Amino acid sequence: MNARFALPLIVVATACLSACSGGEPGDAAGAKVLRNLLERAKVPAKLVSFKKTSGRGAHIGNADVYEYQYEAEVQFPEGYEAQCADEKERGPCAALGIASNRSFPKNEILRSEGMLHFSGTEKGGWIGEDGQTY
């Protein structure tokens, strides 16, 4: 094989194998998990932007876990009344990154920061808080 083509081919193959072997959850996985959590909680919202800001992996017992921090912009096309004061589990308010009751007028955009958790699979993927594999 011509040497000038060998190095780029090796770089591309390595990138493909790294991407396919699990790696860390990226922006697409995080955005999908957040959309699914909001939909499941019946929050009438549209994810306008989403960006992973940091993350860290750990090995706990026999499991790999990943803590994923993000910034997001969420729009409420029809408005929304967030009832957070009595939220006892990770529900819509946790997904939105807010802790107290709040009213969002029609089309308001919330800029929020939050955290998602993923658990590793045996095949190298990640299971998000929405129960889906990425």
What would you call each of these model-derived segments?
Residues 20-134:
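Cystatin/cathelin-like cysteine-protease inhibitor module
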Residues 1-18:
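Sec-dependent bacterial lipoprotein signal peptides
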